[in-house]
From Swiss-Prot:
Organism, as annotated: Homo sapiens (Human)
Pfam families with a match to the protein in the record: MARVEL (PF01284)
Domain MARVEL: 20-173
Protein name as annotated: Synaptogyrin-1
GO cellular component, one term: azurophil granule membrane
Keywords: Acetylation, Cytoplasmic vesicle, Membrane, Synapse, Transmembrane, Transmembrane helix
Biased segments, Polar residues type: 213-233
Length: 233
């Protein structure tokens, strides 16, 4: 297959980790992976407080367990998704089929855009619940830094995932253009629909000394009728 299809070279080449880590979409995946760890790690470790009066834990975001559950779920799933697509980035240059590369890039566009939307919803949801939280529920301000960190990195994750979607779309455009060129281009020498070129008699010196004319071999059988020849006895 042609080199450069959908942002990668020819299949079967040696794995180059240096080239991999320099790719913008790979860098954004690693950053998104780290952001997801911060979000779900902050909520799991310090997002639940102990109630002295009730004797049970409650979510730091306005005592709304759905807010904490959403943040943890999105963070964990985004963490796994980043690992999946990082593995795809490693394997992508080995994909020899242009159609398979196209499917991988299209899935990258859809998944990245979907996660950007989920992080936007998560940011708005956590920020709203944090804003309406009652100070009396947490008089000692326990876990407030972790709660703010989860909100902040949810906001940052919107742009890292949106950036991945944009980069994947650019790779799709490059791949679509190269695939269109490879399908439309045809070597004229391989085109069977073109008429044969007329024969042109060479005008240069004749290396065989034939004088540029066709000569019948001496031993060729003569098919023309011959007259009767008398034979002497």
């Amino acid at each position: 297959m042609e080199g450069g299809a959908y942002g990668a070279g020819k299949a079967g080449g040696a794995f180059d980790p240096y080239t991999l880590v320099r790719q913008p979409h790979t860098i954004l995946r690693v950053v998104s992976w780290l952001f997801s760890i911060v979000v779900f790690g902050s909520i799991v470790n310090e997002g639940y407080l102990n109630s002295a009066s009730e004797g049970e834990e409650f979510c730091i975001y306005n005592r709304n367990p759905n807010a904490c559950s959403y943040g943890v779920a999105v963070g964990v799933l985004a963490f796994l998704t980043c690992l999946l697509y990082l593995a795809l980035d490693v394997y992508f240059p080995q994909i020899s089929s242009v159609k398979d590369r196209k499917k991988a890039v299209l899935s990258d566009i859809g998944v990245s855009a979907f996660w950007a939307f989920l992080w936007f919803v998560g940011f708005c949801y956590l920020a709203n619940q944090w804003q309406v939280s009652k100070p009396k529920d947490n008089p000692l301000n326990e876990g407030t830094d972790a709660a703010r960190a989860a909100i902040a990195f949810s906001f940052f994750s919107i742009f890292t995932w949106a950036g991945q979607a944009v980069l994947a779309f650019q790779r799709y455009q490059i791949g679509a253009d190269s695939a269109l060129f490879s399908q439309d281009y045809m070597d004229p020498s391989q085109d069977s629909s073109m008429p044969y070129a007329p024969y042109v008699e060479p005008t240069g010196p004749d290396p065989a000394g034939m004088g540029g004319t066709y000569q019948q071999p001496a031993n060729t059988f003569d098919t023309e009728p011959q007259g009767y020849q008398s034979q002497g006895y």
